[in-house]
Amino acid sequence: LVEDCALTFGSKYKSIIVGNYGDAAIFSTDHTKPLNTLIGGFVYTNDIDIATSIRAMRDDCGDLSNEHQRLILKTYIDEHRIETVNHKIYIMRNYKKALMNKLHIHNEISPYLELETSAKIAINPYYSYPAKLPSVLAKIGLHVLEQYKANIHQRQSWLKEILQVVEKKEDMPAAYYDTGCDIIPLRIAYSTHFALTVFSYIDDWIWFKTPIVATKENICDFGYHWGGCPVAEKIGKSIMNLPVIIDSKQQNIFLRNIKKTYSYGI
């Protein structure tokens, strides 16, 4: 049993931290995740045999070229600087990237390792895949982890305030009210009511709408059969990102808008 814990990182169920229920746990750290190293991830296990096998697989992986690593670092810095300073510039940057992709104006090397998104197995000539996580990204990951630790209490208090505003349990899944769940909110499941509230004043930046993402191909081409992962299919339509990094001023604005909308009975 392998747990995918990237979006439940640090949360507990019945006092056990997620990632300890199965034989191993995976935590991707791409730029959609709370621990953002742009690309990459890590594996956690208490099973010595599994750990030994994974290390052997890692040692057999190639390294990304110096050019590719520099491109990844530059992209990480650009995204972090633009997103935290001016959201409008960040959005315009994404539009520009989308247009260039549409016109097929782009570099052969992508920092996101996007050539592995096809159902057709092929070895690309531009980089090793899978590849070892560059040391610079591991260093960034350690720094981000420290930031994340300092942010946990704020996130939990934020969720508590949201639930106090919503009040009625039918607006949120029962798990948010379960005392056996110690949730560090990174995504939030919403009802239609909550969706109308939040999406009325912020961009709805939703990820993972289907069980297989980050591909332009039909997911059935990967061997997926609809109904095979009913939970993933259901919650994919009702999950919204909460900002990974948010200051108290932004948090107050978020809560104020929710309170305002609910007071009108929308």
Summary of predicted features, one role per range:
Residues 239-249:
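Proline-centric
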Residues 99-107, 125, 218-233, 246-248, ...:
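Non-catalytic terminal extensions of PLP-dependent enzymes
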Residues 4, 29, 41, 155, ...:
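Generic structural signal for small/hydrophobic residues in well-ordered secondary structure
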